[in-house]
Structures are given as C-alpha cells and as structure tokens.
C-alpha cells in the first residue's frame, strides 16, 4: 500500500497552522501558518468605535475558516502529496473558545442585526469578563453540595462555557434568545467541514461540566442559578457528545474543493490543543505529566481512579486517551509573562546590546540569566500575570515580584519570572502527587521547550524530575493528525486506536533535562518561600490584589459613570 497521510490543523491564540503528517512514522512533510486577520479583539469591535470592557477577549470566526482554505492547500502544494493519499483531517483548538450560532450554524456576529453586539462574537479562552458568573456558579454549587464541583478542583473557571453563556444571558438577553446553540470553536470548525454539528467529549467534559456517566448538572441546579437557564443543557447545549478519535463526518465537496482535498475523507471530532499533544509525545499510560508550553501551560496526566485534586481544571473519563481518566491543570500565563517583560520591562540599552550581538532580546536575557546561580538574584515572583488557573482557580489574582534593589538587573528579573512559572508547575505536581495521582516524569511540548533550554532546566530542578521534550515542534497538530488517522481507520491506511498511532507516530528527543542535585536543594528553599507568598496572597489572608483590581475596574469606566 502506498504511504498514507493525514492533516492536523492547530488553532492557537494568534494563528492557525496546518501540518501534513506521514502516518508510517509521524514525520511532518509540510506545515503552513495563517495569522488570524483580526487577531485577538480586546480593545474595539472591528470597524467600529465600540470599546470592549475590561478583560474581554474576542475573535472573528471567519479567521478560522481562512486557515483551512489557506494553510491546507499550502501544505498540499509544498509536499507534493497526491490528494488521493490523504485519508483524513483533524483539528485542535484553544478552549473554552465559544460562540453563539443560529439554526444554520451561522455565528451571530455575521448577522447584520447582531454584529455590533460584542456578545455575538467568539469569546476567546482568555476572556475573563465572566468572573462574577463563575463566582456565583461556585457559590451555588457549594451551597447545594453538587457532586461535580470536586471534579473541577472545587472551582469552575470564568474561562469555561457556563460562565460565558450566563454572561451573555445577563448582559445581552436578545443574543441569548436568538442563539440556537452555544458551541466550542473546535466543534464549530468541524461543522464547517462536515455540514453537521458533532460535540466532542473533551471540551464537554473539561469546559462545560459534562460527565460521561452523569451528564450535565441537573436542570434544578441551573434553575437555582437563574430561572432562565433551567433548560440550557437540553436546548442550547443539546446534542450527542462523541469520544475523541471518532469520525465526525465526511469532508463536504465545497470545502474539499477550497482545501485541495478529496470530498468524503474522514474528519475527526474536535479536540483541545493541549490534549491533542499527549499522544504526540507517545504518552498513553499514567505517571507521565505532559506540559503543553506556550503563552500558557496546560498540564495533562492520565490516571486509573477518579480522585479529587485541589485546583485541577477537571478529570474526564476518556477525556485525553480512551480507557483512562484524563486529569488537567494549568497556568494562565507563562510565555506571555516573558513576552510582557521583554516588551514593557526592558531598557533600550538591552535592546541595543541584543542588536549588537545579532540575537533577539529573549536569547540575550536567557544567556545572561543562565550565568546566575539559583537564588543569586535575591528575587522571588508569583506567576499570576493572567490570574491563577491551578491550583487556586482565581482570575482576580495578579502578578508580584519581591526583592528589587537598585542593583537589580534585567536578566535577574527574567530568571525570577522563569523560576516563578516553574514554582507554579511544582505546586500542580505536588497537588496531584499528594492525592495519589502519581507524577514520575515530565514531558514538554510546544514553543517554549524548543527555544528556552534554561527554562527547561529550571523546571527539572524545581520539580526534581526528568523532563523529556517532544521531537515535533507541532505536537498539537501532530496529535490532531493522529486522531484523524484513527477516525479514518486501518481499512484505508490509518489506525484503529490512538495507542497504535502513538507507537508509530509519537516521538521525543534523545536529549533530556535531568535535575541538578545542588540546584534542587536551593530551589527547595525558594519554593517554600513561594508557597508562603502563594498562600498569603492567594488564599484570603491578604486580598490586596483583588482590591487593586476592583479599584482599577472602577477607574476603567467612562468618566460619565464615575459618580
């Protein structure tokens, strides 16, 4: 049989990427990136003077379609592969990135009567303006003793589906009423390829409080939140929920023509970017924590028993690999913190030095920071620049840096920020391990492990665990392509399980990062100081961060409202 291929399409925060994969060995033959034309919409609605509120983050749904019609033909052209040999396509997406659609699956923001209402647009994963709704959900769930709450670490996030839906209902009831279904973007883009809406078990479980055995929370719970929400799950969240690796449908002829593929090939059900990466590094068994590292980190771990772990984002049966419980935790900002510092916290002299040496500022700071010993800077940071996802699940927290002096240098700050993100991961590892969900080794994928060796060594030292790094630079896309091979099946040259696909296609580099014992000892002391700050500012002893944010929010309002 001739070699067969699938395509994985990875939808990130700023762009989408298509990768063409050889199913015999997981090698990437071609990849292409399409930046989102509208990017992240967080100031004004496109082509209007309508200003968005504090902590809003929207996107334009047609940017997602453009990825399919631009990047997929590009990888076909670059590779020279015959369309007859491409047997399937799979996608992964940021989550919870959601949108309201009408009866035809049309996003409401594309309808003339709703285009000027921000609530009709795609709400990106990092839209945090529904925090008050998340707080109310958590309070009600705790008051009623809802069984689902411990499965999400005791708190539902403002980033997730129900909080965002409730915000729409409360602030734009006309949009809510016009909505036929609220969809994850990953399910919506699959529907654009297949002509039918199929919902995946991953986002339903991790982002919409769905349980394989129990379903959604009861109508009574939703009625207690808001009587208008009573029938939400049987109306606007209705539909069958399908396991990962299943075939959502065949590629529509009109989309096939635009994408340069054959109509009818398998389209896998949607997936989440981070979760798709797990089999791409060959992980299909427990004890191995996979970190998808980029602007943020998503931590994923397989287990055999359902345990309650503080601050986990969820535990979902078959949520990552069929046959296991999939645990998820995360950090809301990692690469974003380093990028923020380089953009806003570095002097012109540092930029000049980088230019003279012919390197970028990140590389210069990494090189200088690598010459420092652990603890040498005298600095300690809390990595909450975009709130805390795990283990505190609180978007109202903010970043902190302690220990500045007049002698503090940029590279010292940079290293302290790297260390802070490692401490955040250590807190997550300890939370899992302490509840019997064992973590023996770490796997890293995404952009950061490929670029920043110092960061990976610090993570190994702080967690005192060996770290293996993905051989692929595009692990979510590779994982999406692997699930596409399962959706296609062995009869046409694919695989019959994700475990089979992972054995052939999942890969890690030969080089690993091992803990350095003398560094481990120093970082243990620093980590204990981190825990002290973490608990003091994060568990209610001093809510100064929240008070500052509240004051900022008041001052952010138009002057006419400041009375």
From Swiss-Prot:
Recorded catalytic activity of this chain's protein: D-ribulose + ATP = D-ribulose 5-phosphate + ADP + H(+); L-ribulose + ATP = L-ribulose 5-phosphate + ADP + H(+)
A molecular function (GO) term: ATP binding
Range of residues in the leader sequence: none
UniProt record, GO biological process: L-arabinose catabolic process to xylulose 5-phosphate
Keywords of this entry: Arabinose catabolism, ATP-binding, Carbohydrate metabolism, Kinase, Nucleotide-binding, Transferase
GO cellular component assignments: cytoplasm
Superkingdom to which the source organism belongs: Bacteria
Regions crossing the membrane: none
InterPro entries, per database record: ATPase_NBD (IPR043129), Carb_kinase_FGGY (IPR000577), FGGY_C (IPR018485), FGGY_N (IPR018484), Ribulokinase (IPR005929)
Enzyme Commission number(s) from the entry: 2.7.1.16
One Pfam entry name: FGGY_C
Pathway: Carbohydrate degradation; L-arabinose degradation via L-ribulose; D-xylulose 5-phosphate from L-arabinose (bacterial route): step 2/3
Family, similarity comment: Belongs to the ribulokinase family.
Alphabetized NCBIfam families for the sequence: L-ribulokinase, PRK04123.1
Protein name: Ribulokinase
Organism: Halalkalibacterium halodurans (strain ATCC BAA-125 / DSM 18197 / FERM 7344 / JCM 9153 / C-125)
């Amino acid at each position: 049989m001739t070699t067969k291929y699938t395509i994985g399409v990875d939808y990130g925060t700023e762009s989408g990427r298509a990768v063409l994969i050889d199913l015999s060995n997981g090698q990437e033959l071609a990849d292409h990136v399409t930046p989102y034309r509208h990017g992240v919409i967080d100031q004004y609605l496109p082509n209007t003077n309508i200003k968005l509120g504090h902590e809003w983050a929207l996107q334009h749904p047609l940017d997602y379609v453009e990825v399919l019609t631009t990047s997929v033909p590009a990888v076909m052209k670059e590779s020279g592969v015959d369309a007859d040999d491409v047997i399937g396509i799979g996608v992964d997406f940021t989550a919870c990135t959601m949108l309201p659609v009408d009866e035809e699956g049309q996003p409401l923001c594309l309808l003339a009567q709703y285009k000027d209402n921000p609530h009709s647009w795609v709400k990106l994963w990092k839209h945090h303006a529904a925090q008050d709704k998340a707080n109310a959900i958590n309070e009600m769930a705790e008051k009623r003793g809802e069984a689902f709450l411990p499965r999400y670490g005791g708190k539902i996030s403002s980033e997730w589906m129900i909080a965002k839906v409730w915000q729409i209902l409360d602030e734009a009831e006309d949009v809510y009423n016009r909505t036929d279904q609220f969809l994850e973007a990953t399910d919506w883009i699959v529907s654009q390829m297949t002509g039918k809406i199929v919902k995946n078990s991953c986002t339903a479980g991790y982002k919409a409080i769905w349980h394989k055995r129990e379903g959604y929370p009861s109508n009574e719970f939703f009625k207690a939140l808001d009587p208008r929400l009573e029938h939400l799950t049987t109306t606007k969240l209705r539909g069958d929920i399908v396991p990962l690796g299943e075939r959502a449908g065949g590629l529509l002829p009109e989309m096939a023509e635009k994408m340069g593929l054959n109509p009818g090939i398998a389209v896998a059900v949607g997936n989440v970017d981070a979760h798709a990466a797990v089999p791409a590094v060959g992980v299909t068994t427990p004890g191995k924590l996979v970190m998808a590292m980029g602007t943020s980190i998503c931590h994923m771990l397989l287990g055999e028993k359902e345990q309650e772990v503080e601050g986990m984002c969820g535990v979902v049966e078959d949520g990552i690999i069929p046959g296991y419980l999939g645990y998820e935790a995360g950090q809301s900002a990692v690469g974003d913190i380093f990028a923020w510092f380089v953009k806003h916290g570095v002097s012109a002299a540092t930029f000049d030095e980088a230019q003279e040496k012919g390197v970028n500022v990140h590389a210069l700071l990494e090189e200088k920071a690598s010459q420092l010993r652990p603890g040498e800077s005298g600095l300690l940071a809390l990595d909450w620049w975009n709130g805390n996802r795990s283990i505190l699940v609180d978007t109202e927290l903010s970043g902190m840096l302690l220990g500045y002096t007049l002698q503090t240098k940029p590279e010292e700050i940079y290293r302290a920020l790297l260390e802070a993100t490692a401490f955040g991961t250590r807190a997550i590892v300890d939370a899992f391990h302490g509840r019997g969900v064992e973590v023996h080794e770490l796997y890293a994928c995404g952009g950061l492990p490929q670029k920043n060796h110092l960061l990976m060594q610090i993570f190994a030292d702080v967690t005192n665990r060996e770290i293996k790094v993905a051989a692929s630079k595009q692990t979510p896309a590779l994982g999406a392509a692997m699930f596409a091979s399962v959706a296609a099946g062995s009869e046409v040259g694919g695989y019959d399980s994700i475990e089979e696909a992972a054995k052939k296609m999942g890969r890690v580099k030969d080089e690993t990062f091992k803990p350095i014992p003398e560094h481990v000892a120093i970082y243990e002391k620093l980590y204990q100081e981190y825990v002290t700050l973490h608990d003091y500012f994060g568990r209610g002893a001093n809510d100064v961060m929240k008070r500052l944010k509240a004051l900022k929010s008041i001052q952010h309002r138009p002057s006419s409202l400041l009375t």
